[in-house]
């Protein structure tokens, strides 16, 4: 995917800004940040007023790029940074942007086949990180999320996220 002779994986992170480039205006050394997984060249219609996730230059940091988060220091674009939510731990802060971006891309990233109000969506693993984001995106978009869980004690959590219904997969012998 890239031509560098090395690869540092990892697409989700939170941390403290250690250094900034000369053109960076919004961030300074010492800022506590969350790093979003999207990188792009910033020079097309989708990056400038559209949806950068649909940019032809869009790539996932640490997966399609050589420099990811599994390092002591990570190199990112300034537009990848978000202020770290103070009510979340460092670990909690690090994990939500990747699963949110992944769920968003699954539901809205295949034009013209995108999620619309009234659509029914089966969300397998609805109580996990990716599934819980998918349920919330469905609810926010007016779609009907039906969550699939593996334990009955997860039902209420998924319903509180906005699911219209929940199926416990252990109540069924066959999904074929």
Predicted regions and their residues:
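N-terminal Rossmann-fold NAD(P) dinucleotide-binding loop
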Residues: 10, 131-132
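A glycine-rich, Thr/Ser-enriched phosphate-binding loop motif common to dinucleotide/cofactor-binding enzymes
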Residues: 64-70, 86-111, 124-127, 133
């Amino acid at each position: 995917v890239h031509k560098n002779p090395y690869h540092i994986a990892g697409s989700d992170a939170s941390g403290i800004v250690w250094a900034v480039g000369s053109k960076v205006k919004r961030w300074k050394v010492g800022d506590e940040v969350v790093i979003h997984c999207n990188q792009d060249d910033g020079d097309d219609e989708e990056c400038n007023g559209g949806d950068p996730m649909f940019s032809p230059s869009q790539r996932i940091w640490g997966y399609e790029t050589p420099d990811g988060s599994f390092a002591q220091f990570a190199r990112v674009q300034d537009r990848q940074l978000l202020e770290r939510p103070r009510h979340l731990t460092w670990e909690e802060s690090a994990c939500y942007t990747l699963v949110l971006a992944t769920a968003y891309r699954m539901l809205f990233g295949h034009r013209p086949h995108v999620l619309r109000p009234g659509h029914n969506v089966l969300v397998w693993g609805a109580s996990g990180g990716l599934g819980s984001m998918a349920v919330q995106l469905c609810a926010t978009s007016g779609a009907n999320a039906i969550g699939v869980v593996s334990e009955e004690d997860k039902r209420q959590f998924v319903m509180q996220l906005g699911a219209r219904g929940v199926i416990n997969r252990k109540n069924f012998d066959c999904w074929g």
